[in-house]
Amino acid sequence: MRRRRAGGRTMVERASKFVLVVAGSACFMLILYQYAGPGLSLGAPGGRVPPDDLDLFPTPDPHYEKKYYFPVRELERSLRFDMKGDDVIVFLHIQKTGGTTFGRHLVQNVRLEVPCDCRPGQKKCTCYRPNRRETWLFSRFSTGWSCGLHADWTELTNCVPGVLDRRDPAGLRSPRKFYYITLLRDPVSRYLSEWRHVQRGATWKTSLHMCDGRTPTPEELPPCYEGTDWSGCTLQEFMDCPYNLANNRQVRMLADLSLVGCYNLSFIPESKRAQLLLESAKKNLRGMAFFGLTEFQRKTQYLFERTFNLKFIRPFMQYNSTRAGGVEVDEDTIRHIEELNDLDMQLYDYAKDLFQQRYQYKRQLERREQRLRNREERLLHRSKEALPREDPEEPGRVPTEDYMSHIIEKW
């Protein structure tokens, strides 16, 4: 009787110990996962998630309604950018669109075989190709304002080839291929930001505005102020100047100004001039290798990376600010700014739709390709499992015992 009781107690103790071991193991695994789980992937080598699997980018809106029709060729935008060849990225920097931040990303934040050499105290970085001492990037922070301060499309397309030929003589090699890129911004936000910048003393008066081989005359481009700058100007004064280049700046800087007689307003009627500028800006925007939107930083990063097959080291940050840039602006004033920038409003509406459609197209294409890869992997796995196995039994192999009985006996 005592032996039975002793045996019963022993079995109970063994079972209790087993339960404690299992519970302790579960708690340990839970704690381990809490600390290490976010960075672990059971299927990834070394337990780390590959950078490409970290989805930093927003999910496309499935209910997005397209406003304009764009053929697939306008949405694909996948280039074979050859950094070791003769390809050059040209950044058209429009004032107050976030171009300074993006320009720094290009020289400091792109994962490159040979990173740009950016030294403290110097305004420009050296961005050489991996195989020779030639620049692959034409921008403010790499080549400086070589075609003039904030050069526009008309200036850059006529100036960049000559500047690079003087810097890096082409010799007998094939001609360079230029990939133009830019950023756009909501016109009201951009306009208010430019006013605040001018109010603090900015002028951009050293800009050349070169067109058809000459700069505009004072009669073609009168100043909005007298003196060295326009610091302290009110928003009303800023809006009242009919010659203010802030009005429809994005359209003007993206259009081919030669089509409208440059800055000669008497060349063609105003209504026709406006329509030609808008259509030219749209055409040139479509023809660019890439453009981003200030209001969509992560999507801008995504499209740039997929277009040029280049990766940024750190993700872009979205800094949301008010339209008025910290200044109270009533609805009537906003409507007036929209009227002054009617061409920019139309261009931005067009650009935003093209941008969103490109993003959706790229994401859908990637998901489709991922599903195909997963399907191929499953089929390959099944085909391997279906192969006949002819492995002979190992001599002297003992049949596996019941796991629970084995653990209890060990205790």
UniProtKB/Swiss-Prot annotation:
InterPro entries: Heparan_SO4-6-sulfoTrfase, P-loop_NTPase, Sulfotransferase. Its EC number is 2.8.2.-. It comes from the Eukaryota. 3'-phosphoadenylyl sulfate binds at residues 93-101, 185, 193, 317-319, 323-324. One of its GO terms (molecular function) is heparan sulfate 6-sulfotransferase activity. The chain crosses the membrane at residues 20-37. Glycans are attached at residues 264, 320. 6-O-sulfation enzyme which catalyzes the transfer of sulfate from 3'-phosphoadenosine 5'-phosphosulfate (PAPS) to position 6 of the N-sulfoglucosamine residue (GlcNS) of heparan sulfate. Critical for normal neuronal development where it may play a role in neuron branching. May also play a role in limb development. May prefer iduronic acid. The lineage of its organism: Eukaryota, Metazoa, Chordata, Craniata, Vertebrata. The keyword Cell division does not apply. Residues 352-386 form a coiled coil. The active site is at residue 150. Residues 380-401 are annotated as: Disordered. This is Heparan-sulfate 6-O-sulfotransferase 1. Keywords: Coiled coil, Glycoprotein, Membrane, Signal-anchor, Transferase, Transmembrane, Transmembrane helix. Substrate binds at residues 123-124, 140, 145, 150, 197, 204. The gene is Hs6st1. It comes from Mus musculus (Mouse). Residues 1-19 are cytoplasmic.
